[in-house]
Structures are given as structure tokens and as C-alpha cells.
UniProtKB/Swiss-Prot annotation:
This is Formate acetyltransferase. Signal peptide: none annotated. It comes from Haemophilus influenzae (strain ATCC 51907 / DSM 11121 / KW20 / Rd). Several mechanisms have been proposed based on complexes formed with substrate analogs. After activation by the glycine radical, the cysteine radical, Cys-420, can abstract hydrogen atoms from the other active site cysteine, Cys-419, and from coenzyme A, and it can also transfer hydrogen atoms to product radicals. The other active site cysteine can attack the central carbonyl of pyruvate and covalently bind the product acetyl group. Its EC number is 2.3.1.54. InterPro entries: Auton_GlycylRad_Cofactor (IPR050244), Form_AcTrfase (IPR005949), Form_AcTrfase_GR_CS (IPR019777), Gly_radical (IPR001150), PFL_dom (IPR004184). Residues 5-635 form the PFL domain. GO terms for biological process: glucose metabolic process.
Length: 770
């Protein structure tokens, strides 16, 4: 082992050594130094006076945002970079963890590298004009990601975007879904990481000179140079707050602060749709435990550090357009913190700090950010399981993902969730985010020969429409299969263009600087409208579905398409997804597998491995608006079921049947995640608090139960609340300033939703029996 320098000796005193001291290996550090905790929550401390004062100050701004549905303030003059803004504070004298995206709390910045039109539109919507100098620079001199994408898009892709058969593509905003290993800055200090990056850069010289994979080698060398530069700027930004982060952190406060500065660099330089925080709780616990044992801090002070970190994560803001908000409602950032789970060696990764992170929901009230994500295992300590159930019942603010499914799949216990349901190994994998394709609309294209049922224009391949008086399942399925081939090709082509241009014009240097040199990439496609498509095909197969044909007119009343199936008459009953009926559940599983296999056949940018999610965020409302009447009886414009959820009100056999249907969806063909949002009224869980906690924990054990022959569910949002409370919150928002609920893949402050989105949430199934 090489000799440690004096700063490393000081910072690492008392830690068990290992490979982590020679190489960047945070997992090795954690495994050799963390303390599993199987006790209860009785050790937890309440908020300090400083925490309460700071949070009250922040809440004043949040209340204004909720009321106005607008930013508190934004800077329309300064393109945001790691070092663009002067230091900002809530109250410098009270903050234990410092750092804001701009110079004022909740003030937003502009990020024009992704696209100048979106920035200009955001400014205009909120009554300001983008600085003309910025517009000139990013129009005449500096090409943006958005411009690059639209220079290359095909007419077919543009039609798919217009119709809504592809929606939410990250072609005008930051793609996100990349998790920097922010822990590295705390463990090693920036100087060590810069030296490591220079070694990576130098390691490519021979390949460069020999012409090995020439274009890829040149690109990677340039990217590493940008990463090295970003680390230098990170150091500069931290220095503006009075901190020298050249060397490793020496105590818990520094470890949290160093780590947060690294994340702050990411969110100052990128406005990705999901800017996840990673898996930090157990790492932080190592430092807190060392300080507690040395008598340097008390439990109250430890909790205060965690509260102040979480407070900062609650304050992340980006300037968005109303169109973006329709897709991703309620200002989500997906500052996802992944906690708990089990280690490969059988020890739990639950620590006291896992409890502290969840306890912030009590010390500062509920909040949608950070997106607290619990990796559930049947082997988790019983005390922790009961505490999780208590938190869900009290706050409806956390989500659960199946560690027993994903840990063996990765053969790794240091993965985290990006955004909502997307797992990746921290610092070693990244994702090319791909939004989602509309399977319900694809089915209508199959029936109508590629004519869009809303616009009347030819979007899909021009084929003869199905003219049968009663739809035949085999005929429809054959056509559907062909249209899924077409859609997969349009989808992957669009994503290849998007991610080539994002790498070229809006590269995430600050995030990728905290990754290994050679990164495993996934191309994360997605599907929406699964339950609509499955129920529609079930209706065609098991009932009688007669198309009602008619003309489609444009907004001026001109006929643009004739003899199009614009509605459907259904005779008889049909099995509906969400009731543990294999007749329809098998159709849903087939659609997932079928579309994934089609995507897997196609060539991807940077040889990214194709994956797929069943996830909608809140775009289930937008998709519904863009999709006409469907053969399952759903009316034109009505929202889809979110994520992998059954359609609203169709899961009629109770919680277990609904959960069982969703758990059947094959993770092997949806490794980017399968989102299920579950709402249950408190009384359905039990008559008293103890019974409710026990039953909810048991329900999750059952849903996530995983073995070789029976796959467990992958994801579960849990809401425990009554519909009446949500109705009251719609009418009296001031009574519920922090009311938080789970929606597809994330949490949202109920008051930040539009009335239409609130109504969609209220009309969803609230399970009243197990």
C-alpha cells in the first residue's frame, strides 16, 4: 500500500483500511466501516431551533410558489454554470450545511445549453424577457442541444412528436437520470479525484495515437478533459463559500458539506428531468458514528446536520415551461435518495442514519423532495420495517423498491435509483433517458392504418385500415405487432439523435467526473398506456367490439380523414387488468416483452444496452388528452392509468389482487422499472396504529416476495389517506400547506398540482379492502 499523506491520515483516522485507500472504491469503504442497526427509532432527536427557523423561512417562499404556480424569482441574465453565481444563504448564521443554486433561496437560474427556446419561453410565461445578449449568444454563436436534435430529426419523428405517440422526449430540456457518485468528493477530496482523472486521460494516449476506435477515443478524451475542468470549478465554487475541499473530509459535517457541494455543482450546471442524489445515508453514518464515539457531536447535532442537508435538497429548483409541467407536474426534481436494502454478505445496510433521513419528514414536515426511496427486502430488520410503515401511514411521502429483485440482478449492493424506478450502480452506470411511447395510440393506429384518430393525419405507415364490423383479436394483434416494429424504430432513432446531441452540446461534466472512466450505458425506453392497451385487447378477445367509423375534421371544420374508427361499441363483459386474472394479465405481460424485444434488435448510440420502464410520471393526463376513444371503453381525453397501474376504478377485487396483477409484469423486459402507485384508506389496513403498521409491512413483504420461480413486484408508491381529505385540500389549500402524496414514481406537494391533475388523483382507485 502506498504511503498515506498527512491529510489522508487525519481524515481517515479510525477507519478500517482497504482497497478504497488505493483506488476510488466507495463501496469497499462502506463495507469495511459501516455499523448495521437493528434497533428501533427511540434514539431519534427532534429539530433544533435553528432547523425550525430556517425551515419556516423556506416555507414562506414555498407557500407563495404553491399559491401562484410560478417561480418565487429567477435570474434571466446569467446562464448557470458551476461558478456563475455568488454564494447564497437562507441565514448564514444558522446553516450547518450551505450552498444554493443562485444567490437567493428558491431563486431559479437559466440553463440555455439545452435549448434557448425553452429558456425564452419560460421567461415569457412568467412575465419577463430573456436578456437579449444571452439570446444572441445562444442563437448566433453557441449551438444548443435542442437545435442539434432538430437539425437531424426525420419527418417521421416530428409527426410522432406532434401526435403524441411519442411524448416527453428530452430534446429541449436536460435528460438527467445520471447519478454522480457525490460521496467520492467527501472520501477523497477533489485533488485526489483530479489526479485520477488525469491518469484516465493519459491512459487513452496510446489508443489515440494508434487510431483504436478513433472517434470514440477522441470523444472520451475530450469528455475526461471536461470532467477534470469541472472538478476544478467545483473546488472554486466551494471556496466561494469559505471551504477548501481539496482534501478528504475530516468529520461528519465536512463529509455532508463536501458531498452536497458536489451535488450542487451538478444542479448548477444541468437541469435534467431527474437529478438524483444517490445512496448516501450509510456512507454518512460512518462519519457520524465516528464523531459520536469520539464525543465530537451529540445525536441532536447529528440529526441537525441531516435535517440541513435534506432542507437543501428540498430547495432545488429549475425554470420550466407550463408544457413541461404537464408532463412532470408539481415541480419535481427527483433528488432521489436511496436508502436501506441488504448487503451481498447478508448484513443489512440499514444504519441509524437511515432512520435519521426518514425522521426529517417529522422534524420539518412532509415534502416531495428528496424523493425518499426505500430498498425493501424481506430480510430487513423488523424494527425498521415497522418504522417505514409508520412513515408511510403518517406522511404518504416515500416509495419502495424491491432489493431482493435488483440486488441479485446486479450482483451489487451499491446501486441507487435514478428518478423514480431506474436502478443503476453508482459511479459505474448511467442512463440515456428516453421518456415513453404510447401503446394505446399505437393500437388505434393499427386499427386505422396509421391515421391519427385526433389529428386525421397519416403518422404511422400507410396500410389498409381494419374494416371488420367486429374486431378480430388475431387480426388486430398481427397489425399491432407490425406497428410496434415501426414505433420501436422511430423511438430508438429519436433517442440516438437526442443523446448524441446532448453529449455534444450539453455534456454533464460535473456528474460524469464522479464516474469511472468506462461507464456502462443503458438506453432507457418506456411505455405508457399499458393498462389501456391490455384492457382494449382483452375486450376485443373476450367481448364483442364494434368500431364506430366517422370523419375527422380540423379546427376550421374541414374534413381531413374519412371512415376512421373514432369510437367503439362493446357488447359483453371482458376481464380487466388489475384483478389477478391471467386472461388479461398475460396480455399486459406480452406487450411489455414484445416491445422490449423489438427495441433490443435496434442499434443504439454508444452501444447503450436497451432497457424499458412502465412509468408515466403525470404524463398519463397528457397522453389521455392526445388519445381518442379506445376499445376498452375509455373516453377520448380521459387520463390513462399511471405507470403500471390498472385503469381508474377497474381493479375491483381489493389490494392483493391488484398488487398481484402488477407483480406479474416481467422485470427481465422492464429493467428500467415498473411503477405502481397504491392508495389505501387507513381503516382498510387495520383498526389501530399497531395493526396498520404490521399489515402494511406484511403487504409489502408479500408484494415484493421474490424467488427463482416467482418474481416479486419492482416498485410501490404507498398513499395512506382518505379521498375526503384530498377534496378538502382542493377547496382549502391553506389548511394543507405541506400535504404530500405519491404519484407515478415520485411524490408531489398536492397544492402544486393543477385542478385537473388534482382531480385525476382523486378519481384513482382508493383501496378499501385488503
Amino acid at each position: 500500500m502506498s504511503e498515506l499523506n498527512e491529510m489522508q491520515k487525519l481524515a481517515w483516522a479510525g477507519f478500517a483500511g482497504g482497497d478504497w485507500q488505493e483506488n476510488v472504491n466507495v463501496r469497499d469503504f462502506i463495507q469495511k466501516n459501516y455499523t448495521p442497526y437493528e434497533g428501533d427509532d427511540s434514539f431519534l432527536a427532534g429539530p433544533t431551533e435553528a432547523t425550525t427557523k430556517l425551515w419556516e423561512s423556506v416555507m414562506e417562499g414555498i407557500k407563495i410558489e404553491n399559491r401562484t404556480h410560478a417561480p418565487l424569482d429567477f435570474d434571466e441574465h446569467t446562464p448557470s454554470t458551476i461558478i456563475s453565481h455568488a454564494p447564497g444563504y437562507i441565514n448564514k448564521d444558522l446553516e450547518k450545511i450551505v450552498g444554493l443554486q443562485t444567490d437567493e433561496p428558491l431563486k431559479r437560474a437559466i440553463m440555455p445549453f439545452g435549448g434557448i427556446k425553452m429558456v425564452e419561453g419560460s421567461c415569457k410565461v412568467y412575465g419577463r424577457e430573456l436578456d437579449p445578449k444571452v439570446k444572441k449568444i445562444f442563437t448566433e454563436y453557441r449551438k444548443t442541444h435542442n437545435q442539434g436534435v432538430f437539425d437531424v430529426y426525420t419527418p417521421d419523428i416530428l409527426r410522432c412528436r406532434k401526435s403524441g405517440v411519442l411524448t416527453g422526449l428530452p430534446d429541449a430540456y436536460g435528460r438527467g437520470r445520471i447519478i454522480g457518485d457525490y460521496r467520492r468528493v467527501a472520501l477523497y477530496g477533489v485533488d485526489f479525484l483530479m489526479k485520477d482523472k488525469y491518469a484516465q486521460f493519459s491512459s487513452l494516449q496510446k489508443d489515440l495515437e494508434d487510431g483504436v476506435n478513433l472517434e470514440a477515443t477522441i470523444r472520451l478524451r475530450e469528455e475526461i478533459a471536461e470532467q477534470h475542468r469541472a472538478l476544478g470549478q467545483l473546488k472554486q465554487m466551494a471556496a466561494s463559500y469559505g471551504y477548501d475541499i481539496s482534501n478528504p473530509a475530516t468529520n461528519a459535517q465536512e463529509a455532508i458539506q463536501w458531498m452536497y457541494f458536489a451535488y450542487l455543482a451538478a444542479i448548477k450546471s444541468q437541469n435534467g428531468a431527474a437529478m438524483s442524489f444517490g445512496r448516501t445515508a450509510t456512507f454518512i453514518d460512518v462519519y457520524i458514528e465516528r464523531d459520536l464515539k469520539a464525543g465530537k457531536i451529540t445525536e441532536t447535532e447529528a440529526q441537525e446536520l441531516v435535517d440541513h442537508l435534506v432542507m437543501k435538497l428540498r430547495m432545488v429548483r429549475f425554470l420550466r415551461t407550463p408544457e413541461y409541467d404537464q408532463l412532470f407536474s408539481g415541480d419535481p426534481m427527483w433528488a432521489t435518495e436511496t436508502i436501506a436494502g441488504m448487503g451481498l454478505d447478508g448484513r443489512t445496510l440499514v444504519t441509524k442514519n437511515t432512520f435519521r433521513i426518514l425522521h426529517t419528514l417529522y422534524n420539518m414536515g412532509t415534502s416531495p423532495e428528496p424523493n425518499l426511496t426505500i430498498l425493501w427486502s424481506e430480510q430487513l430488520p423488523e424494527n425498521f420495517k415497522r418504522f417505514c410503515a409508520k412513515v408511510s401511514i403518517d406522511t404518504s411521502s416515500v416509495q419502495y423498491e424491491n432489493d431482493d429483485l435488483m440486488r441479485p440482478d446486479f450482483n451489487n449492493d451499491d446501486y441507487a435509483i435514478a428518478c423514480c424506478v431506474s436502478p443503476m450502480i453508482v459511479g459505474k452506470q448511467m442512463q440515456f433517458f428516453g421518456a415513453r411511447a404510447n401503446l394505446a395510440k399505437t393500437l388505434l393506429y393499427a386499427i386505422n392504418g396509421g391515421i391519427d384518430e385526433k389529428l386525421g393525419m397519416q403518422v404511422g405507415p400507410k396500410t389498409a385500415p381494419i374494416t371488420d364490423e367486429v374486431l378480430d383479436f388475431d387480426t388486430v394483434m398481427t397489425r399491432m405487432d407490425s406497428f410496434m416494429d415501426w414505433l420501436a424504430k422511430q423511438y430508438v432513432t429519436a433517442l440516438n439523435v437526442i443523446h448524441y446531441m446532448h453529449d455534444k452540446y450539453s455534456y454533464e461534466a460535473a456528474l460524469m467526473a464522479l464516474h469511472d472512466r468506462d461507464v456502462y450505458r443503458t438506453m432507457a425506453c418506456g411505455i405508457a398506456g399499458l393498462s389501456v392497451a391490455a384492457d382494449s385487447l382483452s375486450a376485443i378477445k373476450y367481448a364483442k367490439v364494434k368500431p364506430v367509423r366517422g370523419d375527422i375534421k380540423d379546427k376550421d371544420g374541414n374534413v381531413v380523414a374519412t371512415n376512421v374508427a373514432i369510437d367503439f361499441e362493446i357488447e359483453g363483459e371482458y376481464p380487466q387488468y388489475g384483478n389477478n386474472d391471467n386472461r388479461v394479465d398475460d396480455i399486459a405481460c406480452d406487450l411489455v416483452e414484445r416491445f422490449m424485444k423489438k427495441i433490443q434488435k435496434l442499434k443504439t448510440y454508444r452501444n447503450a444496452v436497451p432497457t424499458q420502464s412502465v412509468l408515466t410520471i403525470t404524463s398519463n393526463v397528457v397522453y389521455g388528452k392526445k388519445t381518442g376513444n379506445t376499445p376498452d371503453g375509455r373516453r377520448a381525453g380521459a387520463p390513462f392509468g399511471p405507470g403500471a397501474n390498472p385503469m381508474h376504478g377497474r381493479d375491483q377485487k381489493g389490494a392483493v389482487a391488484s398488487l398481484t396483477s402488477v407483480a406479474k409484469l416481467p422485470f427481465a423486459y422492464a429493467k428500467d422499472g415498473i411503477s405502481y402507485t397504491f392508495s389505501i384508506v387507513p381503516n382498510a389496513l387495520g383498526k389501530d396504529a399497531e395493526a396498520q403498521r404490521r399489515n402494511l409491512a406484511g403487504l409489502m413483504d408479500g408484494y415484493f416476495h421474490h424467488e427463482a420461480t416467482v418474481e416479486g413486484g419492482q416498485h410501490l408508491n404507498v398513499n395512506v389517506l382518505n379521498r375526503e381529505m384530498l377534496l378538502d385540500a382542493m377547496e382549502n389549500p391553506d389548511k394543507y400547506p405541506q400535504l404530500t402524496i405519491r404519484v407515478s414514481g415520485y411524490a408531489v406537494r398536492f397544492n402544486s398540482l393543477t385542478k385537473e391533475q388534482q382531480q385525476d388523483v382523486i378519481t384513482r382507485t382508493f383501496t378499501e379492502s385488503m
